[in-house]
Protein backbone atom coordinates (compact mmCIF):
# COMPACT_ATOMS: atom_id res chain seq x y z
CA UNK A 1 0.00 0.00 0.00
CA UNK A 2 1.35 3.47 -0.85
CA UNK A 3 2.41 5.53 2.14
CA UNK A 4 4.39 8.73 2.54
CA UNK A 5 6.44 9.44 5.66
CA UNK A 6 6.12 12.77 7.46
CA UNK A 7 9.69 13.99 7.91
CA UNK A 8 8.85 15.77 11.17
CA UNK A 9 7.72 12.75 13.19
CA UNK A 10 7.85 9.72 10.90
CA UNK A 11 4.08 9.24 10.70
CA UNK A 12 3.04 7.09 7.74
CA UNK A 13 0.29 8.64 5.62
CA UNK A 14 -1.75 6.54 3.22
CA UNK A 15 -2.71 7.93 -0.17
CA UNK A 16 -4.15 6.86 -3.51
CA UNK A 17 -3.06 8.62 -6.71
CA UNK A 18 -5.13 8.48 -9.89
CA UNK A 19 -2.07 9.54 -11.89
CA UNK A 20 -2.05 11.23 -15.24
CA UNK A 21 -0.87 14.60 -16.45
CA UNK A 22 -3.67 16.73 -15.00
CA UNK A 23 -3.22 19.40 -12.35
CA UNK A 24 -2.93 17.62 -8.98
CA UNK A 25 -5.71 17.98 -6.42
CA UNK A 26 -5.26 16.62 -2.89
CA UNK A 27 -8.57 15.57 -1.33
CA UNK A 28 -9.32 14.99 2.37
CA UNK A 29 -12.58 13.96 4.01
CA UNK A 30 -14.19 14.59 7.37
CA UNK A 31 -13.59 13.44 10.93
CA UNK A 32 -14.50 9.78 10.29
CA UNK A 33 -13.73 9.52 6.57
CA UNK A 34 -11.19 7.33 4.82
CA UNK A 35 -10.15 7.58 1.18
CA UNK A 36 -13.00 5.19 0.40
CA UNK A 37 -15.42 7.91 1.48
CA UNK A 38 -13.50 10.73 -0.17
CA UNK A 39 -13.59 9.02 -3.57
CA UNK A 40 -17.39 9.25 -3.40
CA UNK A 41 -17.48 12.89 -2.26
CA UNK A 42 -18.89 15.81 -4.22
CA UNK A 43 -15.44 17.35 -4.41
CA UNK A 44 -14.07 14.23 -6.09
CA UNK A 45 -17.03 13.90 -8.44
CA UNK A 46 -16.59 17.53 -9.50
CA UNK A 47 -13.17 16.84 -11.05
CA UNK A 48 -13.30 16.07 -14.80
CA UNK A 49 -11.06 13.06 -15.58
CA UNK A 50 -7.97 14.10 -17.46
CA UNK A 51 -8.10 17.74 -16.42
CA UNK A 52 -7.15 17.02 -12.81
CA UNK A 53 -5.06 14.38 -11.06
CA UNK A 54 -6.87 13.34 -7.89
CA UNK A 55 -4.75 12.35 -4.89
CA UNK A 56 -6.85 10.94 -2.03
CA UNK A 57 -5.23 11.09 1.41
CA UNK A 58 -6.16 9.49 4.74
CA UNK A 59 -5.82 11.84 7.70
CA UNK A 60 -3.43 10.65 10.39
CA UNK A 61 -5.65 8.79 12.86
CA UNK A 62 -8.00 7.53 10.14
CA UNK A 63 -8.16 4.92 7.39
CA UNK A 64 -4.84 3.27 6.58
CA UNK A 65 -2.65 6.08 7.94
CA UNK A 66 -0.87 5.77 11.28
CA UNK A 67 -3.12 6.24 14.32
CA UNK A 68 -1.15 7.62 17.26
CA UNK A 69 -2.97 7.83 20.59
CA UNK A 70 -1.06 10.87 21.89
CA UNK A 71 -2.92 14.18 21.37
CA UNK A 72 0.42 15.90 20.74
CA UNK A 73 0.76 13.89 17.53
CA UNK A 74 -2.19 15.82 16.07
CA UNK A 75 -0.74 19.31 16.40
CA UNK A 76 -1.57 21.29 13.27
CA UNK A 77 2.09 21.89 12.29
CA UNK A 78 2.48 18.09 12.14
CA UNK A 79 -0.84 17.43 10.41
CA UNK A 80 -0.17 20.11 7.80
CA UNK A 81 3.03 18.32 6.78
CA UNK A 82 1.19 15.04 6.09
CA UNK A 83 -0.19 15.96 2.65
CA UNK A 84 3.08 17.76 1.87
CA UNK A 85 4.86 14.45 2.51
CA UNK A 86 2.51 12.88 -0.04
CA UNK A 87 3.36 15.57 -2.59
CA UNK A 88 7.07 14.99 -1.95
CA UNK A 89 6.62 11.23 -2.38
CA UNK A 90 4.92 11.81 -5.73
CA UNK A 91 7.38 14.48 -6.88
CA UNK A 92 4.66 17.15 -7.03
CA UNK A 93 5.63 20.75 -6.32
CA UNK A 94 2.23 22.43 -5.92
CA UNK A 95 -1.36 21.21 -5.79
CA UNK A 96 -4.89 22.28 -5.11
CA UNK A 97 -6.29 21.17 -1.74
CA UNK A 98 -9.96 20.24 -1.31
CA UNK A 99 -11.25 19.21 2.11
CA UNK A 100 -14.56 18.93 3.92
CA UNK A 101 -15.10 19.45 7.65
CA UNK A 102 -12.01 17.95 9.36
CA UNK A 103 -10.35 18.14 5.94
CA UNK A 104 -11.43 21.75 5.51
CA UNK A 105 -9.72 22.67 8.76
CA UNK A 106 -6.59 20.87 7.60
CA UNK A 107 -6.78 22.92 4.40
CA UNK A 108 -6.52 26.10 6.44
CA UNK A 109 -3.56 24.55 8.26
CA UNK A 110 -1.79 23.73 5.01
CA UNK A 111 -2.45 27.26 3.78
CA UNK A 112 -0.82 28.59 6.95
CA UNK A 113 2.16 26.24 7.18
CA UNK A 114 2.97 25.46 3.53
CA UNK A 115 1.48 28.20 1.33
CA UNK A 116 4.21 27.74 -1.27
CA UNK A 117 2.84 24.25 -2.02
CA UNK A 118 -0.76 25.41 -2.53
CA UNK A 119 -2.38 26.45 -5.81
CA UNK A 120 -5.86 26.98 -4.33
CA UNK A 121 -7.87 25.85 -1.31
CA UNK A 122 -11.44 24.62 -1.11
CA UNK A 123 -12.41 24.38 2.57
CA UNK A 124 -15.87 23.00 3.24
CA UNK A 125 -17.84 23.17 6.47
CA UNK A 126 -15.06 24.66 8.58
CA UNK A 127 -13.31 27.80 9.75
CA UNK A 128 -9.71 28.60 10.77
CA UNK A 129 -10.25 30.11 14.21
CA UNK A 130 -10.38 28.49 17.64
CA UNK A 131 -13.14 25.96 18.16
CA UNK A 132 -16.17 27.41 19.90
CA UNK A 133 -18.54 25.60 22.20
CA UNK A 134 -21.47 24.62 19.98
CA UNK A 135 -24.10 21.89 19.66
CA UNK A 136 -21.95 19.90 17.23
CA UNK A 137 -18.77 20.11 19.28
CA UNK A 138 -20.73 18.87 22.29
CA UNK A 139 -22.12 15.97 20.23
CA UNK A 140 -18.60 14.95 19.17
CA UNK A 141 -17.22 15.21 22.70
CA UNK A 142 -20.10 13.24 24.20
CA UNK A 143 -20.06 10.62 21.46
CA UNK A 144 -16.33 10.04 21.84
CA UNK A 145 -16.67 9.79 25.62
CA UNK A 146 -19.12 6.92 25.06
CA UNK A 147 -17.00 5.04 22.51
CA UNK A 148 -15.49 1.78 23.70
CA UNK A 149 -13.88 -0.57 21.15
CA UNK A 150 -15.09 1.24 18.03
CA UNK A 151 -16.77 4.50 17.00
CA UNK A 152 -20.37 3.24 17.13
CA UNK A 153 -21.42 5.66 19.87
CA UNK A 154 -20.16 8.66 17.89
CA UNK A 155 -21.81 7.48 14.66
CA UNK A 156 -25.12 7.02 16.47
CA UNK A 157 -24.75 10.45 18.09
CA UNK A 158 -24.31 12.01 14.64
CA UNK A 159 -27.36 10.17 13.33
CA UNK A 160 -29.50 11.46 16.18
CA UNK A 161 -28.14 14.99 15.79
CA UNK A 162 -28.77 15.22 12.04
CA UNK A 163 -31.77 12.87 12.05
CA UNK A 164 -30.32 10.69 9.32
CA UNK A 165 -29.28 7.08 8.82
CA UNK A 166 -25.91 6.88 7.12
CA UNK A 167 -25.47 4.56 4.10
CA UNK A 168 -24.67 1.00 5.20
CA UNK A 169 -21.15 0.71 3.78
CA UNK A 170 -20.12 4.17 4.94
CA UNK A 171 -21.59 3.55 8.37
CA UNK A 172 -19.57 0.35 8.73
CA UNK A 173 -16.36 2.14 7.76
CA UNK A 174 -17.01 4.93 10.23
CA UNK A 175 -17.79 2.54 13.08
CA UNK A 176 -14.51 0.72 12.43
CA UNK A 177 -12.45 3.79 13.39
CA UNK A 178 -10.03 3.67 16.34
CA UNK A 179 -11.74 5.48 19.25
CA UNK A 180 -8.48 6.22 21.07
CA UNK A 181 -7.05 7.91 17.99
CA UNK A 182 -10.28 9.86 17.51
CA UNK A 183 -10.21 11.08 21.10
CA UNK A 184 -6.57 12.16 20.71
CA UNK A 185 -7.41 14.04 17.49
CA UNK A 186 -10.36 15.80 19.07
CA UNK A 187 -8.61 16.62 22.35
CA UNK A 188 -5.77 18.34 20.51
CA UNK A 189 -8.08 20.24 18.17
CA UNK A 190 -10.14 21.72 21.00
CA UNK A 191 -7.06 22.76 22.98
CA UNK A 192 -4.92 24.04 20.14
CA UNK A 193 -6.49 27.33 19.18
CA UNK A 194 -6.56 28.67 15.60
CA UNK A 195 -5.57 26.47 12.67
CA UNK A 196 -4.36 29.57 10.83
CA UNK A 197 -3.68 33.24 11.56
CA UNK A 198 -2.86 36.40 9.61
CA UNK A 199 -5.55 35.65 7.04
CA UNK A 200 -5.42 39.23 5.75
CA UNK A 201 -1.89 38.54 4.49
CA UNK A 202 -2.70 35.37 2.56
CA UNK A 203 -2.27 35.32 -1.22
CA UNK A 204 -3.73 31.84 -1.77
CA UNK A 205 -7.20 31.67 -3.39
CA UNK A 206 -9.65 30.10 -0.94
CA UNK A 207 -13.24 29.00 -1.54
CA UNK A 208 -15.14 28.33 1.69
CA UNK A 209 -18.25 26.17 1.22
CA UNK A 210 -20.88 26.25 3.95
CA UNK A 211 -24.41 25.05 4.47
CA UNK A 212 -26.63 28.07 5.08
CA UNK A 213 -28.03 26.17 8.06
CA UNK A 214 -24.67 25.28 9.61
CA UNK A 215 -25.19 27.03 12.93
CA UNK A 216 -21.89 25.75 14.33
CA UNK A 217 -19.42 27.26 11.86
CA UNK A 218 -21.20 29.72 9.57
CA UNK A 219 -20.44 32.98 11.40
CA UNK A 220 -16.73 32.23 11.62
CA UNK A 221 -16.61 31.06 8.00
CA UNK A 222 -18.15 34.36 6.91
CA UNK A 223 -15.53 36.20 8.94
CA UNK A 224 -12.72 34.20 7.31
CA UNK A 225 -14.03 34.80 3.79
CA UNK A 226 -14.14 38.54 4.51
CA UNK A 227 -10.58 38.59 5.88
CA UNK A 228 -8.98 36.56 3.09
CA UNK A 229 -7.85 38.82 0.21
CA UNK A 230 -8.75 36.08 -2.27
CA UNK A 231 -11.51 34.50 -0.24
CA UNK A 232 -14.97 33.52 -1.48
CA UNK A 233 -17.91 32.12 0.46
CA UNK A 234 -20.43 29.77 -1.15
CA UNK A 235 -23.63 29.15 0.82
CA UNK A 236 -25.64 26.03 0.06
CA UNK A 237 -29.32 26.74 0.67
CA UNK A 238 -31.19 24.64 3.24
CA UNK A 239 -28.06 22.62 4.08
CA UNK A 240 -26.67 21.97 7.54
CA UNK A 241 -23.12 20.75 8.20
CA UNK A 242 -23.81 17.15 7.15
CA UNK A 243 -25.96 18.03 4.14
CA UNK A 244 -23.21 20.31 2.85
CA UNK A 245 -20.73 17.47 3.38
CA UNK A 246 -22.63 15.16 1.00
CA UNK A 247 -24.00 17.81 -1.36
CA UNK A 248 -23.69 17.39 -5.12
CA UNK A 249 -25.30 20.79 -5.76
CA UNK A 250 -24.56 22.20 -9.21
CA UNK A 251 -23.54 25.51 -7.62
CA UNK A 252 -20.96 23.66 -5.50
CA UNK A 253 -19.45 21.85 -8.46
CA UNK A 254 -19.36 25.03 -10.55
CA UNK A 255 -17.69 27.03 -7.77
CA UNK A 256 -15.08 24.35 -7.10
CA UNK A 257 -14.14 24.10 -10.77
CA UNK A 258 -14.07 27.88 -11.18
CA UNK A 259 -11.72 28.23 -8.19
CA UNK A 260 -9.35 25.50 -9.34
CA UNK A 261 -9.25 26.62 -12.95
CA UNK A 262 -8.58 30.25 -12.07
CA UNK A 263 -5.59 29.52 -9.82
Task: Name every feature range the model reports, one short phrase each.
Residues 239-250:
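Catalytic histidine-centered segment of alpha/beta-hydrolase-like enzymes
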Amino acid sequence: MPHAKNALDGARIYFEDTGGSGIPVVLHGGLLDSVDDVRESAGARALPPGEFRAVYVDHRGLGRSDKPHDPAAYAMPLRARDPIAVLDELGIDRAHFVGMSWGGRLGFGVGAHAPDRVRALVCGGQQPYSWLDSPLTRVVTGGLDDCQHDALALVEAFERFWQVRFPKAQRARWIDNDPQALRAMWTRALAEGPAATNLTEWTVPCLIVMGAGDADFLDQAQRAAAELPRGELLLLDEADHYAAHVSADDALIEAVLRTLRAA
